[in-house]
Amino acid sequence: MSRVAKAPVVVPAGVDVKINGQVITIKGKNGELTRTLNDAVEVKHVDNALTFGPRDGYADGWAQAGTARALLNSMVIGVTEGFTKKLQLVGVGYRAAVKGNVVNLSLGFSHPVDHQLPAGITAECPTQTEIVLKGADKQVIGQVAADLRAYRRPEPYKGKGVRYADEVVRTKEAKKK
């Protein structure tokens, strides 16, 4: 049995937590995040810590409590420190640029690709082949990074495409004659 839910989430100074039934709102210097938790989870805010436990009558209470603890811990980290995700563009002529909240990509298509960023997410390009995404919501950052990668996934023969900075692309050997 996992014991993730047994560990409390420490709420640092400067972070405001509001519990309204199953709706939890966490506000910090990087913004405000809201999440609705499963009915099987009971959350208590005691002494600058959030504690989790199962409600009576739910068979999967501890499992749901562990999930809720992990989600709220990510929310607390997001509103205090924030999350970043780095992408690299590998390929001849592959470029990225950011204008406002739109990421412009040149990925070898006959047309440029413009990707609209959702609210709360910022992007910057330190070089033409790197994109750095920043924001408070871990799930949204990951989804935007996956959407950008999906335009041109790394292909297995030369490794060209959009990849995560820490991604290792396994390349295949070319067909022998």
UniProtKB/Swiss-Prot annotation:
Assembly notes: Part of the 50S ribosomal subunit.
Signal peptide residue numbers: none
Lineage: superkingdom: Bacteria
A Pfam cross-reference name: Ribosomal_L6
Name of protein: Large ribosomal subunit protein uL6
Record has Ribonucleoprotein as a keyword: yes
Record flagged with keyword Membrane: no
Gene it is expressed from: rplF
Family affiliation: Belongs to the universal ribosomal protein uL6 family.
Organism: Salmonella arizonae (strain ATCC BAA-731 / CDC346-86 / RSK2980)
Function: This protein binds to the 23S rRNA, and is important in its secondary structure. It is located near the subunit interface in the base of the L7/L12 stalk, and near the tRNA binding site of the peptidyltransferase center.
GO biological process: cytoplasmic translation
Record-level GO cellular component terms: cytosolic large ribosomal subunit
One Gene Ontology term of the molecular function aspect: rRNA binding
Keywords of this entry: Ribonucleoprotein, Ribosomal protein, RNA-binding, rRNA-binding
Source lineage: Bacteria, Pseudomonadati, Pseudomonadota, Gammaproteobacteria, Enterobacterales
